[in-house]
A protein has these predicted regions:
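Glycine-biased, small-residue-rich flexible motifs in mid-sequence functional cores and linkers
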Residues: 75-276
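Short, positively charged patches
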Residues: 1-125, 129
């Protein structure tokens, strides 16, 4: 049993989940050997039986993902960034394609509505290009509209981008963005997901995806949204974790208090002071 099999097994064990897994490995200072040795004391008899069965399933899951070119990373791996679990609603396991090291680089999440107005489309391109050329990794969700603008503009500027998916890495949704996903990987970017190959898409995947987006960056920039937008999920998560949220000037969003004039290099530069 390796690190990844251990974490995936615990994650799917009845009565566990990401929060308990995080607290367990934290208790033993993220020491794999210690986590394994203490399992006998941690699990009751029913859990021990379930663990053995779930371990077989976890190993098969990892192998199936490997067969479709998807790798895995967990909280016990050194490349798994602390910002994913040292906050509310921790993430402890990821499936991915591409350069996993991007998770530890300075980044900004650029998100928004699936149907932006032409004015905000242009402003979104300008903003994304500015940050990409500064060397910041651009994080978004590969949805239509503002997410597509963020990823595409970043690639056109020669930057690196991370797409956080609500679907498995080998089954990109929406299908119309599968070519864009391939371009992201080919240009040194990264696709990440909490969902294994073969997983069924549900409406609950989207808020979980948005939660990951908010964890990866210290800053969120909203291209266009309103109070009813799904973008508010990531926005609220970001604010809850004490991070800064900006919106392009012209938006009216009740919980956002920082607006930026995209035509002002000084205002864009000011945002970079909060990216660490």
């Amino acid at each position: 049993m390796d690190k990844k099999s251990l974490i995936l097994t615990l994650l799917h064990l009845k009565g566990w989940g990401a929060k308990r897994v995080y607290l367990y490995v934290q208790r033993y200072n993220y020491d794999y050997e210690k986590c394994v040795s203490e399992l006998i004391e941690e699990l009751n008899e029913e859990e021990k039986t379930a663990f053995k069965q779930e371990l077989i399933s976890s190993k098969k899951t990892i192998e199936l993902n490997s067969q479709v070119g998807t790798k895995v990373c967990c909280i016990l791996d050194k490349e798994f960034p602390k910002k994913l679990f040292l906050s509310s609603s921790p993430c402890v396991f990821l499936f991915y394609k591409g350069d996993i090291s991007l998770l530890s680089q300075k980044s900004i999440s650029i998100i928004g509505t699936r149907k932006p107005d032409s004015y905000f489309v242009e402003k979104g391109k300008i903003a994304t290009t500015f940050f990409a050329k500064k060397g910041y990794v651009i994080v978004s969700g590969l949805a239509l509209g503002c997410d597509t603008i963020a990823h595409s503009s970043c690639l056109e500027a020669g930057g690196k981008t991370i797409a956080v998916l609500p679907s498995p890495c080998d089954n990109v949704q929406p299908t119309s963005n599968r070519q864009l996903a391939q371009r992201i990987i080919e240009n040194g970017g990264l696709l990440i997901s909490e969902y294994s190959t073969g997983s069924t898409m549900t409406k609950f995947n989207y808020p979980q995806r948005d939660r990951i987006q908010s964890k990866l960056s210290e800053i969120i920039l909203i291209i266009q949204a309103n109070d009813q937008s799904g973008t508010m999920i990531a926005t609220r998560n970001c604010l809850k974790d004490g991070k800064r949220v900006y919106a392009i000037k012209g938006n009216r969003i009740s919980i956002v208090h920082n607006y930026v004039d995209i035509d002002s290099p000084e205002e864009l530069e000011e945002i970079t002071k909060w990216i660490f």
